[in-house]
Design a protein with these regions (language model features):
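Extracellular glycan-interacting surfaces
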Residues: 1-325
């Protein structure tokens, strides 16, 4: 969800070792806060109705919440029932949390957590190829802005689940999406019916709200889809790497690239190439201009009409970022 507005003048960044806040000042980005450094953070969301209300998920300790832009953090009471939390989705009046083993929970306006049972049932049967002993997890959550009750859940590994009734019931996506290792999902806000999915073996596109899919991985050796986003002008972005993360410590690194499409995902052009770290998360830029690009090397780059430039470096590996207050 695009947080680029007058109140969203800070970048909130989740990493392998804590949360960071950077503020835009005089053309550069300055670190203003750091917290939760004992925790590996897996996801981050900013409340769409309050840019100072920030949620982060941790690998083993559930959620932390701040209502003042990160000055103070506390655990929700009660915390999410399964503390290995991998995915968050902040919606007006509610927060959804996806976990490992794969399950999905929702809390409305600070109330108790309710499990949305269809995700646990729909995610059965998946296993993670590099480590088959690991069961499936909810990797990513997304909402269709054009169809508010339609939700998407990426299961790693187990494919994609879709709900058309605000999470009460879920069904598996099967038509054309033949990669069960789904990392991120983007329902376009500007292109009716278009949905993108970044997967372990490539990138997929749907033009009918996720009912049918076609593989659209840009030509070249990069096949590992890691991230997808859309700016306020409707440009679509995807991050792809040469291979899976367990290869990124080799001499050639991730050799990642950022691709952009201005026609709803029909044609793609390379915007950045040769990025050392994998492009783990993207978020829309300020004033609808381009995107922020975060990497597994702890860098944040800004890409817009002026080109690409590194604005933050030296952080732990980044897992998520969002604009907020």
């Amino acid at each position: 969800m695009d947080q680029s507005n007058a109140q969203a003048a800070a970048l909130h960044i989740a990493t392998y070792s804590g949360w960071y806040r950077f503020a835009a000042r005089n053309g550069s980005w300055e670190k203003t806060h750091k917290a939760l450094t004992f925790w590996k953070l897996t996801s981050l969301q900013v409340d769409p109705e309050d840019a100072g209300h920030v949620y982060v998920a941790t690998e083993h300790s559930g959620l932390f919440v701040s209502r003042d832009g990160g000055s103070q953090w506390q655990r929700p009471k009660p915390n999410v029932p399964r503390l290995t939390t991998n995915a968050l989705l902040a919606l007006p009046g509610s927060i959804l949390a996806g976990t490992w083993p794969a399950a999905l929970y929702r809390a409305r306006n600070g109330s108790a957590w309710q499990e949305l049972d269809g995700v646990r049932l729909g995610a059965t049967g998946g296993s993670f190829p590099p480590s088959p002993e690991l069961s499936a997890r909810v990797r990513f959550l997304a909402a269709d802005n054009q169809t508010p009750r339609r939700l998407f859940a990426a299961i790693e590994v187990g494919g994609m689940l879709v709900s058309d009734d605000d999470g009460a019931h879920w069904s598996q996506v099967k038509e054309g999406l033949d990669d069960p290792d789904v990392h991120q999902i983007l329902p376009s806000a500007r292109h009716p019916g278009v949905v993108l999915a970044a997967c372990g073996e490539g990138v997929y596109r749907s033009t009918d709200r996720g009912e049918h899919w076609q593989k659209i991985t840009p030509a070249g050796a990069r096949t590992f889809g890691s991230s997808v986003s859309e700016d306020g002008n409707g440009a679509l972005y995807l991050g792809v790497a040469l291979d899976r993360p367990n290869t990124w410590l080799r001499q050639e690194r991730a050799n990642a690239a950022l691709f952009v499409s201005t026609d709803g995902g029909v044609k793609w052009q390379a915007a950045m190439e040769g990025v050392d770290g994998g492009i783990m998360a993207l978020c829309p830029g300020i004033d609808s201009d381009g995107v922020f690009v975060s990497t597994s090397e702890g860098d944040v780059l800004q890409f817009n009409q002026a080109g690409a430039r590194k604005i933050i470096s030296g952080l732990p590996a980044i897992t998520a970022l969002a604009l907020g207050a």
